[in-house]
UniProtKB/Swiss-Prot annotation:
Predicted to be exported by the Tat system. The position of the signal peptide cleavage has not been experimentally proven. SMART domains: Molybdop_Fe4S4 (SM00926). Residues 39-95 form the 4Fe-4S Mo/W bis-MGD-type domain. It is found in: Periplasm. The gene is napA. Binds 1 [4Fe-4S] cluster. Binds 1 molybdenum-bis(molybdopterin guanine dinucleotide) (Mo-bis-MGD) cofactor per subunit. It is an enzyme of class 1 (oxidoreductase). The lineage of its organism: Bacteria, Pseudomonadati, Pseudomonadota, Gammaproteobacteria, Enterobacterales. It holds the Pfam family Molybdopterin. Belongs to the prokaryotic molybdopterin-containing oxidoreductase family. NasA/NapA/NarB subfamily. This is Periplasmic nitrate reductase.
Amino acid sequence: MKLSRRSFMKANAVAAAAAAAGLSVPGVARAVVGQQEAIKWDKAPCRFCGTGCGVLVGTQQGRVVACQGDPDAPVNRGLNCIKGYFLPKIMYGKDRLTQPMLRMKDGSYHKDGEFTPVSWEQAFDVMEEKFKTSLKEKGPEAIGMFGSGQWTIWEGYAAAKLFKAGFRSNNIDPNARHCMASAVVGFMRTFGMDEPMGCYDDIEQADAFVLWGSNMAEMHPILWSRITNRRLSDPNVKVAVLSTFQHRSFELADNGIVFTPQSDLVILNYIANYIIQNNAVNQDFFTKHVNLRKGATDIGYGLRPTHPLEKAAKNPGSDASEPMSFDEYKAFVAEYTLDKTAEMSGVPKDQLEQLAQLYADPNKRVISYWTMGFNQHTRGVWANNLVYNLHLLTGKISQPGCGPFSLTGQPSACGTAREVGTFSHRLPADMVVTNEKHRDICEKHWQIPAGTIPAKVGLHAVAQDRALKDGKLNVYWVMCNNNMQAGPNINEDRMPGWRDPRNFIIVSDPYPTVSALSADLILPTAMWVEKEGAYGNAERRTQFWRQQIKAPGEAKSDLWQLVQFSRRFKTEEVWPEALLAQKPELRGKTLYDVLFATPAVSKFPLSELKEDQLNDESRELGFYLQKGLFEEYAWFGRGHGHDLAPFDDYHNARGLRWPVVEGKETQWRYSEGNDPYVEAGEGYKFYGKPDGKAVIFALPFEPAAESPDNEYDLWLSTGRVLEHWHTGSMTRRVPELHHAFPEAVVFIHPLDAKARDLRRGDKVKVSSRRGEVISIVETRGRNRPPQGLVYMPFFDTAQLVNNLTLDATDPLSKETDFKKCAVKLAKV
């Protein structure tokens, strides 16, 4: 085999990434260069995290056989992380589902029956009966859907349209509720628009990086490689890492800070105080572009109303705020002194001062990065608001090399869950169901009767669990996620609700996950390049890919499932007479006719596809479905700062960052010369707000919902590891990744282990007030908790860590706090 220099470098990149994780490289990855004539290559975004790396997918004889980093992709520039190099193997687990499976007994559906193969016709027959019965007897609030930040853009759009316009139910929510909802509400409160204003190009221009509750070395390794390159290429560049335990990102840190859980709120207010006390406020920017408001406090913890913490809260769930003066804000943060902050956080004073100095130095361009440490937090929205405060006080925002940046964990948590509006309270392009004008815009564009979309916010993720247990939500369709394993407090509401005979649960998934095996009907799903798709990453980059192979057996894409199921319902079966009277021409039509086969959606012919191009859904329907749905959806954002490019542009590019105006993408929003919506002379304009000004919020420290006590004496924090993604339903089916980290462990401080007579490798029972798991003690390795805290990853189906977690949420975002609950350990 003869290797070119470029091919040699690619092969070495694979080997280097594998070696860094202690893994062997599959032969197919080593040999890809020599097989280029035999393998067909096409581009796609990676299937895993929200970084949005570009990969080249190699297919041969109807299978994905190879994958390499796309050297033309601006995000990763040809490099993959270890999960990315093993992408081909995620699709070929031995237990891949290839036909629908229904619980049956004596030849028919039974809640306690055994999973039995059925046809799609039989599966849809049962689903249709369950949906129609619930709609007739209880109405739209009795049905619901739990979707995903892994849906393609048109899958999420089709799901939202089917439920909100078709079934007239806002009970649709994505698993992004568990990871990005606090970021969404934080952006909306401060800026009036969602998603970061900066981009990854900031990395090469920044002078300092501050990680707030983000282990980028393992969770966003490609971005971390760029930060590492920037840090090592300039001795003046600084990195600060804040976490409740030490992890791999600390290895690069100039200032590694371990703080007491929940005290990040204190540290953030201290830095604001430091900026003011040291005259580091950018007065010109602040005066022209910022308002000040004091937020409501004592807002509860998103628990059931009967919980003592909710009863005790003075303003449960309040998003209220009132204007305040700068002097009032100055007095508010003045309480967060260095002494008080050091005492509450456990962080040495010199480290706190070093951190504050990064933000206060007018000559340092600072990027703040965060992920789940901020967002999965009972005051996650506040944490987001408070970090924005630091950038707004100093004017370090919306310019190259500086700004706040919320990183995402799923490939299209931004592009689908957030931008499309698959949350229970949202509509496309930052619109919301509670706004009559927004509903009217959607109804007119979709050409459905006025009043079709309900004004009431639907059930969010945790509320869905509670409604299932309470018998109020009776038909529940789960797509593209494994929430039985990933969601909080499994045994309290979710498992009882799923197995309640009153309820019918459908799970669409490629594999028999914990969720699938807990359901009543499993629908086999096409994966990744087995369908045409689009994702939107963390830097507002929308990326397309084409279908490159067919799905195995009878597996079908989520889009196919949604669109085909809509054929089962006529308008008079789901809409009241008052609505039909407005548009009598819709009588007798199916939801497919009204939502998906409309002139707007079906106007793009199959001739726009190349003759040999795979596209199973479109070829079955007779029109280019994906293009029709995308163009209909993109209309919502064009003209007011959410502009997406024409459909075809994305197939010809390595992604484009919105707003895309006159063919040009936007790297930095809200600043003159960078954002087409900021006019000459305005300098900055935060145009999501009516007056064009961003908001600094005064928000205090409030304690966690649950803290260690005499009985449950340790904090538990949960999360991920490099080798596995979320619940491991894909990565654990890759032998190399599974063998690299085969089972979950409890990372614990050696002194905490010694005090409990535990040694490395011992079996240990981890218990909370909600449940228990048996795990293995780990006193060494990549994660090094302080005394008083343990860390556990949640990928292991044999150790359902969410048996332990509390379903407390941020009352504003409804996002769960997976980082803080109390546990105890006992040797087994």
